[in-house]
């Protein structure tokens, strides 16, 4: 038999339980000692001669601190400098070099890196290889004892003055360099003005071409800019192997990593510039020589006289081919658009948007004394081999705007700014100054704020840090105007090895 169990009645209080605030106010909560102050915890940061701190430190990398210039950076620049990062005591730069910031070794530390980079780089400068190009031009015209004409060609290097220019001004300076070489060399050895065999232009010389007469019937080439162009005579060529000016012209290789970039006259097959129709002879041929009277209404049906223009008003030859339909001049733009697309110049060159910056490259950030070396880099103490911890594009951008009156402004400036030096042969339809483009492009330096994410920190860093910014060729960049970095350390995880 089961024994009966007597249940006792439990009395509940009639009042509700005390509030949370009342209970917490009755006695202070117990706090373990390790939370009373910053001690040697896994997230502690210790400065020399100071007690451990929480991970609230920020490290500022400043390129132009006045206290660092005389003792640390007198021989440095804004892309390769030393800076003191210990700010909690009045240390001199020499004393700061003996101080350290120690992170708890039981944790893996990382630093959130944010940088500000400002440059003042012009688009045409020797540092970025945008001041020079080579061209093969005629340097002498001689006659031997038998009366035969001997033409001599040589490769010459042309140098542009450094500066920040628009696309139109860059083309004008390239043409001016060709003319100055002719005046200095070619003219002294019998070379004619019509023998100037390298010209940079912007027109489409095929506009107005009549398929019946095979001539440009308006008698002039359309004075409208379409795309930068290269015009060559036989024996001439342009070499952009060691120059980035081809990027400004918008003419690039389809295989950009292959060595060499030479455009010769022979490459421009199918790009001959058509000859101009002699409009004056054509109109004169249609005029009636007889007087039309009311009794007979006699009028002769004369045949139109279709002939090309052979020389300009100054007597310079247009270098016509024997067929009298085309000139010897060949245009890269015509060969690219109207030539053979499989075997012509279109098969290995590419028409691109002109990059007035010359092709801005990337820059690399190196913090060799602060960040751990990435596994893909070997530790080095040479500037050109510093391990890279961050990368970004050079803060140089091309800015474009539309100017419908570009050619009108160009004509006005010839009188006001005296830019007629760029238009030495206004009577010649080939050698005339190329028209300005309606889409004007300029190079602009825009400050860049970049968040590079979290990078692994060393467990101990020096009070003086080196900051290096190198370009794509691992050279320090003299055009860096301002470089600023902010590093925020934080614990990533516990150290497991």
Swiss-Prot record:
Protein name: Penton protein
Motif Cell attachment site positions after renumbering to this chain: 293-295
Note: All late proteins expressed from the major late promoter are produced by alternative splicing and alternative polyadenylation of the same gene giving rise to non-overlapping ORFs. A leader sequence is present in the N-terminus of all these mRNAs and is recognized by the viral shutoff protein to provide expression although conventional translation via ribosome scanning from the cap has been shut off in the host cell.
A single Gene Ontology CC term: T=25 icosahedral viral capsid
Induction, as annotated: Expressed in the late phase of the viral replicative cycle.
Gene it is expressed from: L2
Gene3D superfamilies attached to this UniProt entry: adenovirus 2 penton base, domain 2, Penton protein, domain 1
Coiled-coil ranges per UniProt: none
Keyword Iron tagged: no
Subunit structure: Interacts (via the cell attachment site RGD) with host heterodimer ITGAV-ITGB5; this interaction promotes virus internalization. Interacts with host WWP1 and WWP2. Interacts with the fiber protein (via N-terminal tail region). Interacts with the capsid vertex protein; this interaction binds the penton base to neighboring peripentonal hexons.
Any Gene Ontology biological process: clathrin-dependent endocytosis of virus by host cell
Its job: Major capsid protein that self-associates to form penton base pentamers, each in the shape of a pentagon, situated at the 12 vertices of the pseudo T=25 capsid. Involved in virus secondary attachment to host cell after initial attachment by the fiber protein. Binds host integrin heterodimer ITGAV-ITGB5 (alphaV-beta5) thereby triggering clathrin-mediated endocytosis of virions. Mediates initial virus attachment to CXADR-negative cells. Binding to integrins ITGAV-ITGB5 also seems to induce macropinocytosis uptake of the virus.
Recorded GO MF terms: structural molecule activity
UniProt subcellular location: Virion; Host nucleus
């Amino acid at each position: 038999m089961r024994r009966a169990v007597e249940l006792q009645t439990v009395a509940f209080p009639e009042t509700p339980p005390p509030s949370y605030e009342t209970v917490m106010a009755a006695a202070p909560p117990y706090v373990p000692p390790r939370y009373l102050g910053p001690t040697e915890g896994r997230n502690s940061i210790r400065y020399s001669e100071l007690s451990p701190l929480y991970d609230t430190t920020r490290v500022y990398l400043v390129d132009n601190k006045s206290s660092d210039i005389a003792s640390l950076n007198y021989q440095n620049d804004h892309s390769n400098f030393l800076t003191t990062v210990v700010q909690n005591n009045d240390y001199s730069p020499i004393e700061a070099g003996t101080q350290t910031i120690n992170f708890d070794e039981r944790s893996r530390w990382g630093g959130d890196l944010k940088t500000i980079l400002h440059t003042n780089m012009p688009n045409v400068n020797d540092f970025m290889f945008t001041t020079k190009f080579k061209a093969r031009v005629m340097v002498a015209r001689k006659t031997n004892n038998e009366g035969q004409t001997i033409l001599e060609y040589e490769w010459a290097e042309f140098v542009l003055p450094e500066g920040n220019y628009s696309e139109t001004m860059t083309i004008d300076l390239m043409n001016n360099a060709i003319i100055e070489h002719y005046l200095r060399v070619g003219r002294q050895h019998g070379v004619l003005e019509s023998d100037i065999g390298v010209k940079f232009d912007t027109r489409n010389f095929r506009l107005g071409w009549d398929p019946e007469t095979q001539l440009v019937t308006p008698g002039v080439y359309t004075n409208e800019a379409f795309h930068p162009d290269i015009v060559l005579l036989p024996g001439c060529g342009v070499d952009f192997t060691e120059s980035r000016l081809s990027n400004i012209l918008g003419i690039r290789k389809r295989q950009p990593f292959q060595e060499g970039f030479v455009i010769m006259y022979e490459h421009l097959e199918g790009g001959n510039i058509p000859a101009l129709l002699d409009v004056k002879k054509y109109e004169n041929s249609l005029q009636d020589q007889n007087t039309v009277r009311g009794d007979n209404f006699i009028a002769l049906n004369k045949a139109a006289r279709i002939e090309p223009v052979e020389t300009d008003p100054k007597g310079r030859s247009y270098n016509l081919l024997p067929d009298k339909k085309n000139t010897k001049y060949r245009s890269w733009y015509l060969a690219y658009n109207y030539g053979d697309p499989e075997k012509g110049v279109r098969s290995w060159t590419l028409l691109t948007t002109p990059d007035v910056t010359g092709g801005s490259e990337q820059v690399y950030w190196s913090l060799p004394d602060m960040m751990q070396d990435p596994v893909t880099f070997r530790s080095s103490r040479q500037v050109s081999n510093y391990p890279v911890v961050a990368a970004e594009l050079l803060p140089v951008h091309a800015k474009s705007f539309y100017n419908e009156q570009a050619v009108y402004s160009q004509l006005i400036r010839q009188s006001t700014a005296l830019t007629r030096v760029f238009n030495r042969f206004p009577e010649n339809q080939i050698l005339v100054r190329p028209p300005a483009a309606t889409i004007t492009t300029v190079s602009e330096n825009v400050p860049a704020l970049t968040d590079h994410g979290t990078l692994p920190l060393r467990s101990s860093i020096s009070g003086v840090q080196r900051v290096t910014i190198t370009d794509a060729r691992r050279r320090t960049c003299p055009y860096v105007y301002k470089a600023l970095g902010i590093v925020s350390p934080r614990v990533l995880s516990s150290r497991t090895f």
